[in-house]
Amino acid sequence: IVFTIPYDLTNQNTELRIYDVQGSLVAILVNQQLAAGNYVIKWEGRNQNNQNVSSGIYFYNIKVGEKVKSGKMNLLK
């Protein structure tokens, strides 16, 4: 998952969460303040309990301050 934090949102709390197709939270990959810049976060296909999840469609939600971006991804194993 690639995302950019613009300079006007630097040092805002940043959250990156993964959800399944039912809308259940699968994993929280980022939950901290980040400086402006480009980021690449690799999700290993594991849930909050570090267990492998099944192949399928998942959704990511990135929130920086009050700005939110969402997207869909396909996990293949």
Where are each of the predicted segments found?
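C-terminal tail/sorting-segment detector
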Residues: 1, 42, 51-77
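A short, hydrophobic/aromatic-rich structural module that often spans a beta strand
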Residues: 33-36, 72
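Solvent-exposed serine/threonine-rich low-complexity stretches and specific carbohydrate-binding patches
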Residues: 26-34
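Glycine-centered coil/turn sites that cap beta-strands in beta-rich domains
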Residues: 1-20, 28, 40-43, 64
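A glycine-anchored, Pro-Gly-centered beta-turn/N-cap motif
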Residues: 12, 35-37, 54-57
